[in-house]
UniProtKB/Swiss-Prot annotation:
Identification of the protein by name: Autophagy-related protein 21
Xref: InterPro entries: PROPPIN, WD40/YVTN_repeat-like_dom_sf, WD40_repeat_dom_sf, WD40_rpt
Record family assignment: Belongs to the WD repeat PROPPIN family.
Chief location category: cytoplasm
Function: Required for cytoplasm to vacuole transport (Cvt) vesicles formation and mitophagy. Involved in binding of phosphatidylethanolamine to ATG8 and in recruitment of ATG8 and ATG5 to the pre-autophagosomal structure. Protects ATG8 from ARG4-mediated cleavage.
Molecular function per GO: phosphatidylinositol-3,5-bisphosphate binding; phosphatidylinositol-3-phosphate binding; phosphatidylinositol-4-phosphate binding
Any one Gene Ontology cellular component term annotated for this protein: cytosol
Subcellular location(s) of the protein: Cytoplasm; Membrane; Vacuole membrane
Motif stretch (L/FRRG motif): 276-280
Amino acid sequence: MGLSRFNQDATCFVTSSEGNSVTIYNCDPFGKCFEMVDEDTQNIGDDDARGDDNSGGDDDLLVEMLFSTNLVAIVHRKQGILKSKKLKIVNIKRKTIICELSFPHPIQDVVMNRKRVCVLLNSDQIHIYDISCMKHLHTIDIWDSQVKSITGQGVDSLSNSGTSNMTSLRERSSTFSKSISPKICLSNDDRSILAFNCYSTSSKSVILNDVVIFDALNISPLNYINSVHKGNVASLAISPDGKFIATASEKGTLVRIFNTGAETESELLTPLLYEFRRGNRPCNINQLTFNSDSTLLGCVGDSDTIHIFKLDSTSRLLSMSVNSEDNSHITSEDIKALRKDPNSKQFTKLISKTIKKSIPSQALRRDFAHITIKNTKTKHILGFPKEFMNQVYVLSNDGSFFIYSLPSTSGSCVLSKQNDFK
């Protein structure tokens, strides 16, 4: 059984079979809502089936829900190279295709809310659409020097390097494993804050450890956070209101939470808010997710423990005071100039300054709550229901759905209910 995901407020979840069935379940009370057999997976021609599958992911189908509506986005990831380039918006209740979009490269991921649909291709491009009419609004090329210019990162070095060097960097990135390919996430609210990680380049290496914050509603850049980890960013999440992003390192031992700067300009001055240690042993982080009011962060990996971190004032990092004689930090005037004219030379001045990093005044904190996984060979995803703030949902690709109660104090979550959907 393929494992897809919860909807934006964890009231429902969607699963896909290894064949062509897409099913939506209600979480509480538990029950099947809709089921659709997608005829597009049948009678696949030989020409369509040939070719490498570079779309990434473990599931045959990529399915993204739009809250509790009948609309879902569907991508066939392993039904041939042609189908992996095609996105369908489907009314699963009526079993009709609303629209169908074709792209030049396989689709890596799809995220959407009530205003925007964002599509990530494995060619490192992001396409932004107006969901009301599916009009194409903007394309972001993660490798494009324009993205670097918008965010103020290395404009001159990229421009002077020439096309051949850019092509070389793209080819070098294609050797990466699928687990460290670019990630995208979109806030649930109508402000539609988009976050994605991008490449930090040098003459010897290409690392996916920078994060861009983009206003997908107004099609404008908001922030650029460089070197959020020493290595690649393995997982990325944004809070429902778009105020915070969470990142996990490729090693899987550290989880960090930053201000996106979407709320106020002053937030950009000290972007790092929280830093947690997941564990000492390496782990592949598959999912990070915030609860509805951004007070909890769930972390799911391939270890035997699901971690839940508490985001409160006691866990927040304290910044060291900046030396008054040191003018190398970013000021609010810099940020105002950045947003007023994103093509000005202010970017060079801005990026040349040393960002004063937040330094923790205490040892890194551990999780507030945890869930022990009995079968580590199965894949799990986590959901925080908005309706029931003291509960946590866990979905397993062996066909099990668990409801846990959060502890009042630090400790283990208590299993309160289990359902099967095989």
